[in-house]
Amino acid sequence: MKTFSAKAHEVKRDWFVVDATDLVLGRLASEIAHRLRGKHKTIYTPHVDTGDYIVVINADKIKVTGNKALDKKYHRHSGYPGGISTTTFGKMQERFPGRALEKAVKGMLPKGPLGYAMFRKLKVYAGDKHDHVAQQPQPLVIQSQA
């Protein structure tokens, strides 16, 4: 018996749509990262992108537990001296709905070209409309545990 290794051109990728209304940020991001990597498939191979496409709608309605809406901080730096900028989860959700989910998922994927290719299969939309009706995405139910 030989160990199976998936080939990139043989992988069948499905499209799924996730409604993020009232789901917890970290738990949702973890499940999405798991599916983007393809770890839910029997043909999973670490060095091949075997994951599916995920479309997230209602990303503006994602929740965080506890007081993290005010306490959770996101930092970035412009590259100039004194150019550090900090924002909270609540402010980021108001200004850029869905960016917190993108950052959470991106942090859970591998770093490097393979991880970047996996991240490109994630499509996040703030409202309940998306541009991927032609791909006929199947609804994916993720259980809320909060």
From Swiss-Prot:
GO cellular component: cytosolic large ribosomal subunit
Keywords annotated in UniProt: Ribonucleoprotein, Ribosomal protein
A Pfam family the protein falls into: Ribosomal_L13
Domain of life: Bacteria
InterPro entries the record matches: Ribosomal_uL13, Ribosomal_uL13_bac-type, Ribosomal_uL13_sf
Example GO biological process: translation
GO molecular function: mRNA binding; structural constituent of ribosome
UniProt feature coiled coil, ranges: none
Residues in the signal sequence: none
Assembly notes: Part of the 50S ribosomal subunit.
Function, as annotated: This protein is one of the early assembly proteins of the 50S ribosomal subunit, although it is not seen to bind rRNA by itself. It is important during the early stages of 50S assembly.
UniProt record similarity statement: Belongs to the universal ribosomal protein uL13 family.
Protein name as it appears in the record: Large ribosomal subunit protein uL13
